[in-house]
UniProtKB/Swiss-Prot annotation:
The lineage of its organism: Bacteria, Pseudomonadati, Pseudomonadota, Gammaproteobacteria, Pasteurellales. The keyword Membrane does not apply. Keywords: Aminopeptidase, Cytoplasm, Hydrolase, Metal-binding, Metalloprotease, Protease, Zinc. The gene is pepT. This is Peptidase T. Belongs to the peptidase M20B family. It is an enzyme of class 3 (hydrolase).
Length: 412
């Protein structure tokens, strides 16, 4: 358990990290996509030096890696802990003004001096947070708990291990850029992160342990038409916009993000751009089951084939499908101790594990493709990617306790 000074330092770290504008930029081709991520990476490098870690490195893409050898047994497992530097693209991360609310008494939470507020009427989980210390933003930005809380929790765990000389296995840490736009792991130096397994500290409520995620792909459908003066268009114009609308109607209406939950997969029309002469449709394909995932890709191909056979077209509709990431569970289940140890650590800390499937992806999914099992552990935060984002100090304390317990249990 953290003492008062360690808890204060945990909060101080987190609040300081939120002052860095690390919002990633959609459409970026290089990483890091924002200068603030490199600034935060350099700050973390200095903290790691002060904590006495070894092999500290910042890559040219702002990936920070470091190593803490075991103080018990050099042959103990090597466990990695990962968090990402960037914040989400959907909401500004500039000039974050965090506010600490001690002993939350329930009811609405006003954010700054504007009209934004967080209400238990919309967020039922607030009823469970009465009496806790909350951290929120001022209603103009997100808070950045996703994932600066994870960074603060990892750094604080390292500090506690050093201060108290607690027994621990070999530890590697990594802080990565551009997780929110899917670029960070493209430049991850796997050779500098040799682990038996790892954890991303990027989950939500206390107790969350996630080791399943969607299989994911992106499909791009291109439809070309023929423009013509509308007064003489009969039997000549081919309106790509009209064809695109009809194409979209070929998908099952009940298999969209807004109609699905749990382990149900979906098709998501994420972009619709163009004009009469040319339209591009971009779809996200998601499914937990590998066979179901492949069937979804076949479905889109069959829909394209049917249109090409039945419709009057300028040229055949084209389809490009690119896999994004796979369900990490295929790898995690080959390293069952990665889940078992986290479960045991949580229970020792008085937390009942909540096994959830991620309706999305994590850096751990990419690492799983490289053969490294990497479940996702809670941070204690809520409402990520939103002006209503918040986190509890108690939840952050719990995450630190779980990390230090995992590395202690691994020594035995």
């Amino acid at each position: 358990m953290l003492n008062q000074q360690q808890t204060y330092k945990l909060l101080e770290r987190f609040l300081h990290y939120t002052t860095y504008d690390t919002q990633s930029k959609s459409g970026a081709k290089i990483s890091p996509s924002s200068a603030g991520q490199l600034k935060l990476a350099k700050h973390l490098q200095q903290e790691l030096f002060a904590l006495g870690l070894q092999d500290i490195d910042i890559s040219k893409h702002s990936v920070v890696t470091a190593f803490l050898p075991s103080n018990v047994n050099p042959h103990s497992p090597t466990i990695g802990f990962i968090a990402h530097l960037d914040t989400a693209t959907q909401c500004s991360g500039k000039n974050v003004q965090a506010e600490v609310i001690e002993n939350y008494r329930g009811g609405d939470i006003a954010l700054g001096v504007g009209e934004e507020f967080i209400s238990p009427a919309h967020y039922q989980f607030l009823h469970q947070l009465i009496g806790k210390t909350l951290v929120v933003a001022d209603g103009n930005t997100l808070l950045g708990a996703d994932n600066k809380a994870g960074i603060a929790e990892i750094m604080t765990a390292l500090a506690v291990l050093k201060e108290e000389n607690l027994p621990h296995c070999n530890i590697r840490v990594a802080f990565t850029p551009d997780e929110e736009i899917g670029l960070g792991m493209q430049f991850f130096p796997v050779e500098k992160f040799p682990c038996d397994w790892a954890y991303t500290i990027d989950g939500g409520e206390v107790g969350e342990l996630e080791y399943e995620n969607f299989n994911a792909a992106t499909a791009i459908v291109t439809i070309e038409g023929v423009n013509m003066h509308t007064g003489s268009a009969k039997d000549k114009m081919i309106n790509a916009l009209t064809l695109a609308c009809e194409f979209q109607q070929g998908f099952p209406a009940e298999e969209t993000p807004e109609q699905t939950e749990g382990k149900q997969g979906f098709y998501h029309l994420s972009h619709f751009t163009g004009h009469v002469e040319k339209v591009e449709l971009q779809y996200l394909i998601r499914d937990f089951d590998r066979d179901g995932f492949e069937q979804r890709k076949i479905f889109i191909q069959q829909l394209v084939d049917r249109f090409n056979q039945q419709k009057r077209l300028k040229k055949p509709i084209t389809l490009e499908i690119k896999d994004s990431y796979k369900n990490m569970n295929e790898v995690v289940k080959t390293v069952p101790q990665s889940v078992e140890l986290a479960d045991s650590a949580m229970r020792e800390c008085g937390i009942e594990p909540i096994h959830k499937a991620i309706r999305g992806g994590t850096d751990g999914a990419w690492l799983a493709e490289q053969g490294l099992a990497c479940p996702n552990v809670f941070t204690g935060g809520y409402n990520f990617h939103s002006k209503h984002e918040l986190i509890t100090l108690e939840g952050m304390q719990s995450a630190v306790n779980v990390i230090t317990t995992i590395v202690r249990l691994a020594t035995s």
